[in-house]
């Protein structure tokens, strides 16, 4: 529904080479800023939109600050073969240090001291819509040590809890790589 799309920040990056580049330039952003943010790429004929013809989702930190975007391919003629793409690593966004949905799930994770880790953006959306408000996902990478640290900080509210959590997280890491 439209309300669900707003809740999750779903968007659409239209087809075309430079829709976003032209829009942001009109707002005073430089091409270098667009490149640095991972929103554009440098091609043989100039700067072009990285996300084109895709459904998009903002990837936020635990405070709700947008760090980057994830996007799903909609059209078969997409020049990027990958079904899903993310903002490339930037000064703000490092996929091995970000969990999609953490902004929506943080309060529930802290309160319930549990987390459900799923595969991707749409899985997080489906889980939240089904009432599983502790669902989060990695952003196109295996669940790693940095992700475990984020989860540990939310679940373990004391040093004993942190120690008790390390063992299960180590086991999880063995089966995610």
Residue ranges: model-predicted function:
Residues 13:
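Active-site-proximal helix/loop microenvironment
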Residues 171:
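Phosphate/diphosphate-binding loops
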């Amino acid at each position: 529904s439209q309300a669900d799309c707003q809740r999750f920040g779903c968007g659409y990056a239209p087809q075309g080479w430079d829709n976003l580049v032209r829009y942001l330039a009109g707002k005073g952003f430089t091409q270098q800023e667009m490149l640095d943010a991972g929103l554009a790429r440098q091609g043989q004929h100039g700067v072009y939109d990285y996300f084109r013809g895709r459904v998009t989702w903002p990837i936020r930190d635990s405070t709700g600050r947008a760090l980057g975007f994830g996007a799903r391919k909609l059209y078969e003629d997409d020049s990027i073969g990958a079904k899903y793409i993310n903002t490339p690593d930037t000064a703000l966004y490092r996929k091995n240090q970000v969990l999609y949905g953490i902004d929506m799930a943080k309060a529930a994770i802290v309160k319930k001291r549990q987390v459900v880790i799923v595969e991707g953006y749409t899985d997080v959306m489906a889980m939240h819509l089904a009432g599983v408000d502790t669902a989060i996902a990695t952003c196109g990478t295996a669940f790693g040590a940095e992700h475990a640290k984020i989860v540990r900080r939310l679940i373990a509210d004391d040093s004993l809890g942190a120690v008790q959590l390390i063992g299960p997280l180590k086991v999880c890491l063995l089966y995610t790589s």
